[in-house]
């Protein structure tokens, strides 16, 4: 039977243990390979300050690489009587290497250990989310260019308003995603700082080389103040959650639009049959369940920052077990958002648009502004032109001229998709993911 890392000469009540461990074993599986990476950097540093011999380091690194491979294969498990991922990794090392395995925790607490695990996990997941956002962005830009000349009604207050285009609609969500990358980039930069060496939040009497572990793990810098490093637990997750929520907000709005435009009363877009579901009683139904679930899941993600903030609310300086609860809402959120992004990209790619919407005369009044502007450009005062066209609409004598000429930046005739593409490319390049990727690869090859 495994012993707890903190175990004393008394037995813990099983119900207390069940309650305090909670779902930690399950959640810690997300962190397993990052716990290994953090340990590899930590023990390399320990050898450099004389707390491990070169021979001990070599044996530990070899075994940690084996454990990392087990994690990559999805075979890593936390045994029933083992408390968490940190205990499991140390137990596996001790079983293989004896007392050498017990040395890896010198100069480290589970507090800074889980902090570095969370940061390594999060920066990997942020990288993957950014990649999936880019895939959806590319689909939206492609559709925007494809349908840039196809007009559709624009709405305000859910009333027919002015001419828009499918080029504008698809392009608007592409630009929204480009802006969302700024929030994700800011969250990444705050995440990509090394907490190792802060121990339980008050540092260590060992002469730890924190810059060395920072470099080994590819962090941009470190959380310098050891007290602040511990205070960052929860704050980091909340900041990242806000960035995820921002992306989710774009998805939720887009999904709502798509559901509306797909319904028979609008008929602006059509989803392929394979992208819909049916009814058990109504044989004609083709429901946009994918977009409905994207909307619901995205709305759930938008509540994530508030959940984390409330768990952290009024906690003083230092570690508290409350923070364990953040794992349960934070760690799975990346899978949820990734799934939504993948489904959105797939269904946008398959979406067909109705190129003949404006054949319906019910949409003619939306060209009234075009007529007002034409009269004003010819010299009639704008208010007089507005009144004249309004009276024609009331009298039923208004005749819509559907040949519109919008040329300014970002309008129907000048989408500026090249500028939006450049914006996304600049925002993606600002992450500098390659530094972390190269550091991890190098660490694993030591």
Language model region names:
Residues 2-38, 99-100, 282-446:
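Glycine-rich cofactor/substrate-binding loops
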Residues 44-52, 168, 238-246, 371-378:
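Short, well-ordered beta-strand elements within core beta-sheets of diverse protein domains
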Residues 55-60, 135, 184, 261-265, ...:
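Short alpha-helical "patches" and their helix-cap loops
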Residues 119-126, 130-131, 145, 153, ...:
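Charged, flexible cofactor/metal-binding loops and thiol motifs
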């Amino acid at each position: 039977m495994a012993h707890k890392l903190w175990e004393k000469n008394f037995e813990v009540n099983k119900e207390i243990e069940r309650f305090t461990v909670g779902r930690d074993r399950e959640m810690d599986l997300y962190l397993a390979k990052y716990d290994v990476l953090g340990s590899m950097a930590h023990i390399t540093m320990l050898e450099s300050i004389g707390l491990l011999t070169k021979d001990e380091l070599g044996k530990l690194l070899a075994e940690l690489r084996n454990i990392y491979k087990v994690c990559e294969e999805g075979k890593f498990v936390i045994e029933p009587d083992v408390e968490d991922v940190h205990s499991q990794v140390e137990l596996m090392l001790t079983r293989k290497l004896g007392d050498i395995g017990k040395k890896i925790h010198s100069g480290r607490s589970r507090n800074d250990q889980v902090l570095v695990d969370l940061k390594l996990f999060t920066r990997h997941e942020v990288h993957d989310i950014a990649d999936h956002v880019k895939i959806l962005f590319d689909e939206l830009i492609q559709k925007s260019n494809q349908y840039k000349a196809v007009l559709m009604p624009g709405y305000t207050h859910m009333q027919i308003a002015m001419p828009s285009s499918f080029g504008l609609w698809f392009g608007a969500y592409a630009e929204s995603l480009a802006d969302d990358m700024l929030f994700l980039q800011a969250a990444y930069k705050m995440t990509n700082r090394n907490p190792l060496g802060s121990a339980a939040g008050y540092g260590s009497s060992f002469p730890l080389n924190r810059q060395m572990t920072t470099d080994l793990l590819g962090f941009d810098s470190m959380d310098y103040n050891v007290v602040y490093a511990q205070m960052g637990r929860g704050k980091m997750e909340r900041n990242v959650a806000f960035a995820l929520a921002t992306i989710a907000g774009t998805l939720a709005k887009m999904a709502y639009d798509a559901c509306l435009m797909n319904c028979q009363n609008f008929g602006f877009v059509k989803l392929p049959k394979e992208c819909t579901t049916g009814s058990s009683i109504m044989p004609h139904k083709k429901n946009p369940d994918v977009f409905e679930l994207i909307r619901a899941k995205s709305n759930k993600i938008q509540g994530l920052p508030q959940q984390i903030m409330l768990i952290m609310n009024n906690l003083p300086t230092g570690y508290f077990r409350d923070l364990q609860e953040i794992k349960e809402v934070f760690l799975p959120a990346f899978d949820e958002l990734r799934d939504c992004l993948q489904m959105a990209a797939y269904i946008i790619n398959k979406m067909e648009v109705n190129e003949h919407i404006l054949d319906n005369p019910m949409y003619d009044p939306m060209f009234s502004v075009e007529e007002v502007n034409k009269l004003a450009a010819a010299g009639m005062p704008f208010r007089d032109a507005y009144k004249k066209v309004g009276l024609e609409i009331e009298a039923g004598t208004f005749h819509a001229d559907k040949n519109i000429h919008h040329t300014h930046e970002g309008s129907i005739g000048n989408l500026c998709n090249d500028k939006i593409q450049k914006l996304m490319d600049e925002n993606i390049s600002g992450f500098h993911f390659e530094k972390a990727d190269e550091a991890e690869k190098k660490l694993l090859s030591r």
